[in-house]
Regions:
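Low-complexity intrinsically disordered segments
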Residues: 32-190
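Charged, low-complexity surface segments at secondary-structure and domain boundaries
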Residues: 24-33
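Short, extreme N-terminal segment that most often corresponds to the first beta-strand
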Residues: 1-25
């Protein structure tokens, strides 16, 4: 059966809120690989919230509770409850915008690392398609349902990196932070 994902972001008061999988009032497909394309309007609308505004973020699958032990420093159960539990709070429908990752950097303030997104796109484009680093690096539950990245990856190393930045403080910036280490992740489909 397919696993569906919802992004969960940190509120300004340190709480958590889920983002509905709707864009401009229309339902957006919610399997991980459906939300893992570089130019996907829904994903970029979510990610635009990180532009010059650091925030914790995770892409939470509806089977994520089966991976709690794989993420000992991540509040997987609380993130799951925020996304899918009774009384979960969700943001209103997102509006599309023209935000892109061109000439930007994805910064992880917890690990003191960053990704040059122009280089990322160059390294990860295969057949004209490129995966989106944010949904894959923050995914919780990969491998628990069809439509997950593990069924599409070129290598086990790529699969192991899915979720590596889940619930870390991320930011999209126009400049690379000087004291941080530049890293590269490959998420290419076979």
């Amino acid at each position: 059966m397919g696993q569906y994902y919802r992004p969960v972001v940190e509120t300004t008061k340190g709480g958590m809120v889920s983002i509905n999988t709707y864009l401009d009032g229309e339902y957006e497909r919610a399997k991980l690989m459906e939300q893992s394309w570089y130019t996907h309007p829904f994903v970029n609308a979510v990610v635009s919230r990180l532009y010059n505004k650091p925030s914790k973020i995770a892409w939470v699958g509806d089977y994520a509770t089966s991976v709690v032990d794989d993420f000992p420093n991540t509040p997987v159960q609380e993130l799951y409850n925020t996304a899918y539990g009774e009384g979960s709070i969700s943001l209103d429908t997102l509006k599309s915008n023209d935000f892109t990752l061109d000439n930007k950097f994805l910064v992880n303030h917890d690990t003191k690392e960053f990704i040059d997104l122009n280089k990322y796109r160059e390294e990860n484009t295969v057949g004209g398609y490129c995966t989106h680093p944010v949904s894959l690096l923050t995914a919780l539950g990969n491998g628990c349902g069809s439509g997950d990245f593990m069924y599409h990856a070129e290598s086990e190393e790529q699969v192991a990196n899915v979720g590596k930045w889940a619930w870390n403080t991320l930011e999209i910036t126009d400049t690379a932070p000087r004291e941080y280490k530049e890293v590269m992740y490959l998420f290419r489909e076979n």
